[in-house]
C-alpha cells in the first residue's frame, strides 16, 4: 500500500538571521504525535532511520504487563489496546490539516513491526518503509527531488488522512546518545499533557502539542536514564526531549530521549508513624535516552 505523505525532517541548526524571534527552529513545533486508544492517550514522535519511519513512544503508552493465569503480572507485555489512532501536524504551525493513522496493534505485534524494550520504558512501531521513486514516477512529476523517497505502508498501519504539507519526523542524524548529552544545557519537551487544565474551561487546545522548557539536570548511570529539570504530566509520556547546544553564533537542536515519568516528591501528612504519605510532582522527570531507540530498531 502506497502511503501518500511527504516526510519532512525537522531542522537541527539555526543562527543569526534565522528565525531570530524563536529560541529553537519553528518547524519543530509539531514534533510530537498524539496517541489515542480505548484506555486513554499519550505522546510519541516519528523517527526516520535506515530508510524507514517509526513511531517512538514510551512502552507504557503502547503496552501493559500481561496478567498471569494464577494471578500477578508477567515479565512480558501485551498491547494496551487493539487499535491506536495517531494524529500529527506538518512543520507549518498555520497548517490546520492533520496526518491521521490507524494502527492495528495486535497485527503489528504479530509481525514484529512493533517492538518494546524489556528493561527500558520505550517502544517503537514501524509505520512506513522509504523507497526511491522510479524514473517513470519522476518523469510524471517534475516536483519530485533527486533524493526524495516515497513511503510504502506496512501491514496493520493505515494512513486515513494526510496533511497538506507532509509529516514531520526526526532524523537519526539529529540525535545525541547518552554519553554525548551535556548536563546543564537547556532542553525542550513536547507532548500532549491531557491531564492538565479543566476541559470545561477550554483553556487548552488538547488536539495540539504543548512545549515545555527546562534543563538537563543529570544522568543516572545505573539506570542509564536522563534526569530532567522539567515538569511533565500524564499524557506527556512518550514525547520527545530535545537538547539545545550553543555552536558559535548559532545553536543546534537534537533529540536526546523519550519522556518516561515524573519524579514524585513524598510528603507525610500527620505524624511520621501514623501519617499518610502524599506524593506530588517534584518538577523533575525521567527520560529514556536515544541509545535504546537504536537498540530496538537494530534488534
Question: Could you describe each region identified by the protein language model?
Answer:
Residues 2-10:
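Bacterial N-terminal signal peptides
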Residues 12-17:
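Sec/Tat signal peptide C-region and signal peptidase I cleavage site
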Residues 18-22, 135, 140-148, 152-238, ...:
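Flexible, gly/ser-rich surface segments that form the specificity/activation loops bordering the active-site cleft
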Residues 23-95, 99-104, 128-130, 179, ...:
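Catalytic histidine site
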Residues 41-42, 117-122, 211-213, 255:
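Extracellular structured ligand-interaction cores
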Residues 53, 121-123, 226:
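Short beta-strand micro-motifs in enzyme catalytic cores
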Residues 98-166:
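Hydrophobic alpha-helical segments and helix pairs
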Residues 268-299:
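PDZ/PDZ-like groove recognition
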Amino acid at each position: 500500500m502506497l502511503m501518500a505523505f511527504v516526510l519532512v525532517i525537522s531542522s537541527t541548526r539555526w543562527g543569526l538571521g534565522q528565525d531570530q524571534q524563536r529560541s529553537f527552529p519553528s518547524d519543530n513545533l509539531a514534533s510530537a504525535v498524539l496517541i489515542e486508544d480505548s484506555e486513554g492517550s499519550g505522546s510519541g514522535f516519528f523517527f526516520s532511520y535506515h530508510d524507514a519511519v517509526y513511531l517512538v513512544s514510551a512502552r507504557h503508552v503502547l503496552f501493559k504487563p500481561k496478567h498471569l493465569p494464577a494471578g500477578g503480572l508477567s515479565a512480558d507485555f501485551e498491547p494496551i489496546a487493539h487499535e491506536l489512532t495517531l494524529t500529527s501536524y506538518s512543520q507549518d504551525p498555520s497548517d490546520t490539516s492533520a496526518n491521521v493513522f490507524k494502527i492495528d496493534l495486535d497485527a503489528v505485534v504479530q509481525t514484529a513491526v512493533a517492538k518494546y524494550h524489556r528493561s527500558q520504558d520505550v517502544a517503537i512501531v514501524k509505520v512506513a518503509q522509504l523507497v526511491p521513486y522510479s524514473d517513470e514516477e519522476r518523469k510524471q512529476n517534475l516536483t519530485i527531488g533527486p533524493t526524495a523517497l516515497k513511503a510504502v505502508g506496512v501491514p496493520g498501519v493505515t494512513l486515513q488522512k494526510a496533511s497538506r504539507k507532509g509529516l514531520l519526523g526526526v532524523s537519526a542524524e539529529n540525535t545525541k546518545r547518552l554519553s554525548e548529552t551535556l548536563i546543564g544545557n537547556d532542553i525542550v519537551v513536547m507532548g500532549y499533557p491531557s491531564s492538565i487544565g479543566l476541559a470545561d474551561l477550554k483553556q487548552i487546545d488538547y488536539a495540539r502539542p504543548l512545549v515545555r522548557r527546562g534543563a538537563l539536570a543529570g544522568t543516572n548511570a545505573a539506570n542509564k536514564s536522563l534526569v530532567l529539570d522539567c515538569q511533565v504530566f500524564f499524557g506527556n509520556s512518550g514525547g520527545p526531549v530535545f537538547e539545545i547546544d550553543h555552536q558559535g553564533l548559532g545553536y543546534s537542536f537534537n533529540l536526546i530521549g523519550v519522556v518516561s515519568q515524573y519524579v514524585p516528591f513524598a510528603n507525610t501528612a500527620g505524624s511520621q508513624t501514623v501519617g499518610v504519605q502524599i506524593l506530588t510532582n517534584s518538577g523533575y522527570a525521567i527520560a529514556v535516552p536515544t541509545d535504546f531507540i537504536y537498540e530496538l530498531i537494530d534488534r
